[in-house]
Amino acid sequence: MKTVFKLPIIAAAMALLPAAAEAQRTPRTDSAAIGADVGVFRPSEDALDSGLALDGFYEYYTSPRVSLRLGLGWTNPGYEGGGNRNLRYVRIGGDLIHNWEGGTIHPFVGAGLGVYVMEPRHDGDSLADSESKLGGVLLGGIEMFTSNTVSIKAEASYHLISNVDNFGPENPDGFKLTLGLKKYF
């Protein structure tokens, strides 16, 4: 008699397992995430030192493997030997990201375009008018899921930015390494 009751319960549980696993899959089509990164930006121009990099973003998944990321980034590398002189970068951009399913670890690559607003500063004051330049970014990294809705990510990116006209350094390109936290909803 006990077997008669156990068998339907076991069959129902087995039937629901694939649905439960699919419901937990992240990312999924039409899901979104917000996140923040902190890291270091190393300009390719010798006249600039490395600087702190901060980024915030919103990411929308068109499929489980493809997403569109809109972001705002800030870095402020100092001039080499320049005392309190630095070159502030603000990036407003969009990136196309492709990721691969790897269980709790998802490697990803991407590319994007953005407007980089650059302004030379000294002791927090502007030294010249800012310049807005078009730039691109190539990126890659890994995302490590700590739960179904939270992940930690490590990312490397190279920023290719149009040359600056009115103040130095002329070439503002650079390499950035970041660690971040991402929350899905």
Specify the residue positions occupied by each region the protein language model found.
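Cleavable N-terminal export/targeting peptides
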Residues: 1-29, 185
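Extracytoplasmic loops and strand-loop junctions of Gram-negative outer membrane beta-barrel proteins
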Residues: 38-41, 78, 121-125, 162-164
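Transmembrane beta-strand segments of Gram-negative outer membrane beta-barrel proteins
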Residues: 26-42, 107
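Solvent-exposed loop/turn segments connecting transmembrane beta-strands
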Residues: 42-52, 80-86, 165-172
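Gram-negative (and chloroplast) outer-membrane scaffold detector with strong preference
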Residues: 24, 52-125, 131-139, 144-150, ...
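Hydrophobic secondary-structure block in the mid-to-C-terminal portion of proteins
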Residues: 153-155, 159-185
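Short, well-ordered turn and helix-capping elements at secondary-structure junctions
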Residues: 40-44, 96-100, 162
